[in-house]
Every structure is written in structure tokens, then in C-alpha cells.
Amino acid sequence: ELRTATLFLSEQDIATSLPVPMHGRVDQVYKTKRGVLIPLDTKSRPMTRVYESDIIQLSVYRIILLHQYNVPVANYGYVRTVTETSTGERVRYIKTKLLSERKVVKLWRRYQSIRSGLVTPSCTCGGDFHSTSR
């Protein structure tokens, strides 16, 4: 899919004030032949893995792109992992389902409440990122 897409943005600062103020520096955004934007973030790490923070970061980029460019944005993105191996670097593209705008706004509001001291931090993912059974 990315092979046939064109590079839309690279190492670009993006921001929006709607639905809440958000900003970031997206690694790459690709535009498919159908005109849909797909965010991509590159991570150098010891193993090929997608973290909760990666999903949140790409989800924020998705919401910003929706509001800044007013064009369709995929509900998924890609995490490109770069890992060192004995024979050199290994690069993997991991397609990742992103959070809805509603969930991103909810996380933003919780973050603001924690920053202002109104709320004590605790897990709120509802099991989206880990098992809730112990």
C-alpha cells in the first residue's frame, strides 16, 4: 500500500486547535492513490514491537491531519521499526489500528486533569493495551 502511495509530508510540524489543541512533528505521511492520508512514525529499538505510546502518538497525528488538511485519513497508521541485528539493520513496517477521535480527546482531557493536579494518575485504557485479568 505504501509502495504505491506518494510522500505527502516528511519531518513536518503539524497542529490543530480542534477538537482540542494538539501538535506534533510527524515523521512521514503518505497519500494513497485514492487520496487517503496514512501517518507513519519510525522507531529505533532493540526489538520489533508497537507500544501504547506509539498508538497514541499516531492517533494524535491522525486527528491533527483530519482537522488541518480536511481530507480523509486512514483509521490506521504504520510504525516503522529499525532494529540492529548481527548482519545490519532490520526494518519492519507494522500496520497499527489507531484510536478514535473521541478516545484521543478523552486522553487529552485526562492528561490536562493530571497536569493540573485535579486527578491522580491511574490506568484508564480499559484493557485496550494490556490484559485486565490478573
Question: What are these regions, as identified by a protein language model?
Answer:
Residues L2-R34:
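Active-site metal-binding core of divalent-cation-utilizing nuclease and nuclease-like domains
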